[in-house]
């Protein structure tokens, strides 16, 4: 079957993308690594020895960046519905984050030790119908915030991909109620046409 013009356009954009080329050169699994690297350069959210949870981790771009910074004294628990090739010293849990059993497995892997940082690059499979996609995206954001509220230590941080649209303002207020400082980030490596932004919440106030 011949490729559609849309898919041909996407392929051209993908292979012409400088961040895709950089990822191949630098040994990262995806261009998404540079989004976290940009945020790290500006905000220094990752430090050696931290305990971090990475949601929506596959194919592993953010986990690669995180594991390199936190080092062998840090701890990283990653999860995704998709398979992810192993990364040294990373605990990976495969499953649907919206499934209570998978959520429980993540909590079990974290254990009793409080977490310093929760990061999430999760997004639903986009249909292109904004009225359907936005609620699914916000639902994932709600679940990630719920997890963060359960596992973060007081003073911990939370970084999540979020899309502008219905439910954004309410969610932003929810996060503000639990953290000292909330900022929005749009990395240069995030495509201009994408509605995605990253919400960075710092200073978890505790339950």
Curated annotation (Swiss-Prot):
GO molecular function, one term: rRNA (uridine-2'-O-)-methyltransferase activity
Record-listed S-adenosyl-L-methionine binding positions: 60, 62, 80, 96, 121
E.C. designation(s): 2.1.1.166
Entry's Gene Ontology cellular component terms: cytoplasm
Gene3D superfamilies on file: Vaccinia Virus protein VP39 (3.40.50.150)
Matches recorded under NCBIfam families: PRK11188.1
Function: Specifically methylates the uridine in position 2552 of 23S rRNA at the 2'-O position of the ribose in the fully assembled 50S ribosomal subunit.
Protein name per its UniProtKB record: Ribosomal RNA large subunit methyltransferase E
Organism: Ectopseudomonas mendocina (strain ymp)
Taxonomic lineage: Bacteria, Pseudomonadati, Pseudomonadota, Gammaproteobacteria, Pseudomonadales
Gene responsible for this protein: rlmE
